[in-house]
């Protein structure tokens, strides 16, 4: 009886040992099966957004709220100045800048486009379309003029303490700086205010880069879009969309 009992117990333990990894693998597979429509990826879908003044997907919203509470203990008020931005809002930003540079400043179209993509994305390709990315400042600090200026996040600037705190703590909450201050990085200029919630934005980027981005951009018929050559768009994809913090790839 004792031997039979031992065999039964070891059999149960063995089955559990086999089943547990299988369950974990099944859960991982289920998580990996989350897919995003091209409309979601390009900011043309209506998605559920959470939080007044936050406007992020649920998981990203919850993570930000926890990070915000933690920052309070360091005397910092994490304030979002930009988060979700749909395609049409991005299109408005693009058109306003294009007309400003070509009409007001008399730039040639190609020069105007190069100027725009120093900081602004081509509509349909913005990470802000995903409900995962935020531009932040310290709400406790008073400053005049444009707040999203790299110098204001440096030593002696109003957001110096915010930058230091985020450098030390943001990753613990799943947020990573997107456009880092890496001299070898190309594409968009350094943005010390722009963070992305990696658990969602990484799979979204992976799915987006699997699409024919060149064709999708050309189909939008954007102002100045006739100057989007194949060479320009290839460079834009490699440098502006993909040359980011490696932790987000």
Regions found by a protein language model. Give the residues of each.
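Extracytoplasmic cell-surface/polysaccharide-interacting catalytic and binding patches
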Residues: 2-249
């Amino acid at each position: 009886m004792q031997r039979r009992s031992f065999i039964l117990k070891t059999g149960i333990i063995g089955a559990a040992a086999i089943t547990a990894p299988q369950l974990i693998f099944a859960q991982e597979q289920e998580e990996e099966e989350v897919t995003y429509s091209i409309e979601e990826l390009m900011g043309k879908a209506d998605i559920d957004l959470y939080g007044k003044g936050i406007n992020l997907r649920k998981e990203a919203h919850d993570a930000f709220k926890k990070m915000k509470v933690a920052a309070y203990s360091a005397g910092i008020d994490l304030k979002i100045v930009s988060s979700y931005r749909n395609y049409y809002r991005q299109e408005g930003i693009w058109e306003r800048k294009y007309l400003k540079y070509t009409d007001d400043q008399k730039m040639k179209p190609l020069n105007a486009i190069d100027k725009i993509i120093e900081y602004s994305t081509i509509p349909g390709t913005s990470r802000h379309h995903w409900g995962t990315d935020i531009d932040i400042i310290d709400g406790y600090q008073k400053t005049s003029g444009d707040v999203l200026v790299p110098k204001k996040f440096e030593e002696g600037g109003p957001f110096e303490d915010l930058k230091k705190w985020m450098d030390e703590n943001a990753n613990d909450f799943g947020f990573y700086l997107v456009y880092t201050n890496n001299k070898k990085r190309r594409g968009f200029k350094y943005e010390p205010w722009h963070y992305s919630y990696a658990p969602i934005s990484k799979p979204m980027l992976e799915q987006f880069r699997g699409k024919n981005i060149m064709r999708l951009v050309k189909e939008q018929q954007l102002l100045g879009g006739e100057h989007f050559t194949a060479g320009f768009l290839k460079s834009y994809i490699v440098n502006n969309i993909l040359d980011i913090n490696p932790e987000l790839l």
